């Protein structure tokens, strides 16, 4: 990375024109790149000439391949049979795969440098905790309680290939690299039938880069309009002050009206909008009226259709009222719940009760969808009744038990932030009984006979180490009173969601 830093230290006109020397300079033989920013692979790899092509790619071979392709009299035209179209002793699809990976690695360099420069001079302690999926929920608990409407948007993808090329053109000024990128991209589309049949040759890193570039372009337009809209000459909530002088009057309000109008101050300090993007979706939480929410919906539909040339249906943008509707967010069902509080106050001989209502974000487990996923993977039927896992009966007893314990712990770990643990106990019960039925089927016995022979110690593995750790963290009286099961716990080590069955 330090070696390539010099290419990025030119003036603004040449800052992004670095792909050409990286592709064609003779001394580019080894390219070391940090995969820590890539969620698909968090190890550090070095691209060497003799690397294993299944996991690593040689920049030297790729450079030779590019030169050889430019020396050809004609371009490679794909045929119906992938084996008939060979190039340098290998299929052309193999080389398109290798080139696309190296292209994604090179183009990611300015993004990684930009991200690193954004953290310079800032003291971020334990920033790795912010990468956790659960770290989003504590922020939402503080923010969503002040909002009443949420706009749930499904980001459309894919779009036209030429739109992706034009998006990248704003960041890369090298025309040769853009033409080569367009050529490889269209070749990938010509081979799309083979991608469906052979999933092992998919290049998730290349398409992840395209998706991130596409979303970055969309968000840059959205945030620009959002920033401009906050300074328009319009009324602000109930206080009827022009927003153009909104920030200048906040200090005056704190001095004069802090004792008389605390509710108005709360409205003034509320952010205009709260934006969260996750898993190809985004949500916009705001305190606007239904009319303004429909205007935001109309804006998104026209943005995708007019600017990105994508047919975007209005049904993909849902307006949810948090006080009435449930918001499906990262596997949870979130909604606002009124939590009444009664405070007893006593002054000398007089005592009185104060009724307060606190708005709290309630996160629940979507039991129906989880049971549907378990039924799809043959852990239970559609009604939630456990059944034996027939495909696992060929494994050893310890392997079967470890698989069930791992799945049970992962689900318990992720849904520990639920406000109601009753549904979580039901899921654990399904997995425990499914494990017993699977072992009984393997040994050609009934469940009752199998449990009598081995005893109840078989299911002790399902008592996760999580409960043991929590018993050490919280006071013993607190843990013994079972109040811990009503507490929401967010973990900061969940970086990504694994497959339910195939996770090792």
Swiss-Prot record:
A molecular function (GO) term: RNA binding
Cell compartment(s), UniProt: Plastid, Chloroplast
InterPro entries referenced in this protein's UniProt entry, alphabetically: Domain_X (IPR024937), Maturase_MatK (IPR002866), Maturase_MatK_N (IPR024942)
Keyword tRNA processing: yes
GO biological process, one term: RNA splicing
Cellular component aspect of the GO annotation: chloroplast
Coiled-coil portions: none
Membrane spanning stretches: none
Main location: plastid
UniProtKB keywords: Chloroplast, mRNA processing, Plastid, RNA-binding, tRNA processing
Function: Usually encoded in the trnK tRNA gene intron. Probably assists in splicing its own and other chloroplast group II introns.
Family, as annotated: Belongs to the intron maturase 2 family. MatK subfamily.
PANTHER family xrefs: MATURASE K (PTHR34811:SF1)
Name this protein carries in UniProt: Maturase K
Species the sequence originates in: Arabidopsis thaliana
Taxonomic lineage: Eukaryota, Viridiplantae, Streptophyta, Embryophyta, Tracheophyta
Name of the gene this protein is made from: matK
């Amino acid at each position: 990375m330090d070696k390539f830093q010099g290419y990025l230290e030119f003036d603004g006109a040449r800052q992004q024109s670095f792909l050409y020397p990286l592709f064609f300079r003779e001394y580019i033989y080894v390219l070391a790149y940090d995969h820590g920013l890539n969620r698909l692979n968090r190890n550090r790899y070095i691209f060497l000439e003799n690397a294993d092509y299944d996991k690593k790619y040689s920049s030297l071979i790729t450079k030779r391949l590019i030169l050889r392709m430019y020396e050809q009299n004609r371009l490679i035209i794909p045929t119906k049979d992938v084996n008939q179209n060979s190039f340098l002793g290998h299929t052309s699809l193999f080389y398109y795969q290798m080139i696309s990976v190296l292209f994604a690695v090179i183009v990611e360099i300015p993004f990684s440098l930009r991200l690193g420069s954004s953290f310079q001079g800032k003291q971020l302690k334990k920033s790795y905790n912010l990468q956790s999926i659960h770290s989003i929920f504590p922020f939402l608990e503080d923010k969503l309680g002040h909002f009443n409407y949420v706009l749930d948007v499904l980001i459309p993808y894919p779009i036209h290939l030429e739109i992706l090329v034009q998006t990248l053109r704003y960041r890369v000024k090298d025309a040769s690299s853009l033409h080569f990128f367009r050529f490889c991209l269209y070749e990938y589309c010509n081979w799309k039938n083979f991608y469906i049949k052979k999933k092992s040759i998919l290049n998730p890193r290349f398409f992840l880069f395209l998706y991130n570039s596409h979303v970055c372009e969309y968000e840059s337009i959205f945030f620009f309009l959002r920033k401009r809209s906050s300074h328009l000459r319009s009324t602000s909530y109930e206080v009827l002050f022009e927003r153009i002088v909104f920030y200048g009057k906040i200090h005056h309000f704190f001095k004069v009206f802090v004792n008389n109008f605390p509710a108005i101050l709360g409205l003034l300090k509320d952010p205009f909008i709260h934006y969260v993007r996750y898993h190809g979706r985004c949500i916009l939480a705001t305190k606007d009226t239904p009319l303004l929410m429909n205007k935001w919906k109309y804006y998104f539909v026209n943005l995708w259709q007019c600017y990105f040339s994508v047919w975007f249906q209005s049904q993909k943008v849902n307006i949810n009222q948090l006080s009435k509707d449930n918001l499906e967010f990262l596997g949870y069902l979130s909604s606002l719940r009124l939590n009444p509080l009664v405070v007893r106050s006593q002054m000398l001989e007089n005592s009185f009760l104060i009724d307060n209502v606190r708005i709290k974000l309630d996160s629940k487990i979507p039991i129906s969808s989880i049971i549907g996923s378990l039924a799809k993977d043959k852990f239970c039927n559609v009604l939630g009744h456990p059944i034996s896992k027939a495909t696992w009966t060929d494994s050893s007893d310890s392997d079967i038990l470890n698989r069930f314990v791992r799945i049970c712990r992962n689900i318990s770990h992720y849904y520990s932030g639920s406000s109601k643990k009753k549904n979580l106990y039901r899921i654990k019960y399904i997995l425990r009984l499914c494990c017993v039925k699977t072992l009984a089927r393997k040994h050609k016995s009934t469940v009752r006979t199998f449990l009598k022979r081995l005893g109840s110690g078989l299911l002790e593995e399902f008592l996760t180490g999580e409960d043991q750790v929590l018993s050490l963290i919280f006071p013993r009286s607190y843990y013994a009173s079972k109040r811990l099961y009503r507490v929401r716990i967010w973990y900061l080590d969940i970086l990504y969601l694994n497959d339910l069955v195939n996770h090792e």
